[in-house]
Amino acid sequence: MIDSIRSSRALIDVRRLGTVDYRAAWQQQRDLADARVAGGPDTLLLLQHPAVYTAGRRTEPHERPLDGTPVVDTDRGGKITWHGPGQLVGYPIIGLAEPLDVVDYVRRLEEALIKVCADLGLDTVRVPGRSGVWVPGDAGRPDRKVAAIGVRVSRATTLHGFALNCDCELGAFNAIVPCGISDAGVTSLTAELRRPVAVDDVVTSVADAVCDALDGVLPVREHSPGARVASAM
């Protein structure tokens, strides 16, 4: 079994918060990170945001909304993205074990979300050089991102996290260059599976998969376009 990436052996405190303003959730993350550094528990926040654009540290001016829509600038990695209703956002506030391996941490988050998609009947992959979880291009369509990941690690503690598109309004992504990637698309579980998949339908399985991946119960496997994860259905 793969070792846990966490420095604590205690269970992760999973909190389902409903809908939370982005700035309020960001402050809550910082407060929880301070508490974790002081010896508090690892925490996983699961929630939705009112519609908002957020920009990571590498966002370029031309990737922002063309109409001047306000953007919240953050201290996470990555570029610009959208959060809003119908998208499950997860913020793991985790103390990482030494030696720190941020790439492994991101791969574990991807693994968890790939499993959730597979259990729903959707084959997803990793795309080399691009974080997140992707539906491979087919029938003339490009690769499509169904889950985005952008994290920050400070004092060996993680902040920010992932966003899984369930039944969100995909048109909101048209005003930006999502994650700075112009040659790929954005999709949702509902769009790909052609049936409604709401946040409430996946929140429990996401919580379980993330905890299992971080603790090594769910091992990281190869999920490239040439080695797709098998559907569980």
Curated annotation (Swiss-Prot):
Residues 57-66 have a biased composition (Basic and acidic residues). Keywords: Acyltransferase, Cytoplasm, Transferase. Residues 38-218 form the BPL/LPL catalytic domain. Signal peptide: none annotated. The active site is at C179. Substrate binds at R76, G77, G78, K79, I80, T81, W82, H83, A148, I149, G150, G161, F162, A163. It catalyses: octanoyl-[ACP] + L-lysyl-[protein] = N(6)-octanoyl-L-lysyl-[protein] + holo-[ACP] + H(+). One of its GO terms (biological process) is protein modification process. PROSITE patterns: BPL_LPL_CATALYTIC, LIPB. The record marks K145 as: Lowers pKa of active site Cys. It is found in: Cytoplasm. GO terms for cellular component: cytoplasm. GO terms for molecular function: lipoyl(octanoyl) transferase activity. PANTHER family: LIPOYLTRANSFERASE 2, MITOCHONDRIAL-RELATED (PTHR10993:SF7), OCTANOYLTRANSFERASE (PTHR10993). Belongs to the LipB family. Catalyzes the transfer of endogenously produced octanoic acid from octanoyl-acyl-carrier-protein onto the lipoyl domains of lipoate-dependent enzymes. Lipoyl-ACP can also act as a substrate although octanoyl-ACP is likely to be the physiological substrate. This is Octanoyltransferase. The gene is lipB.
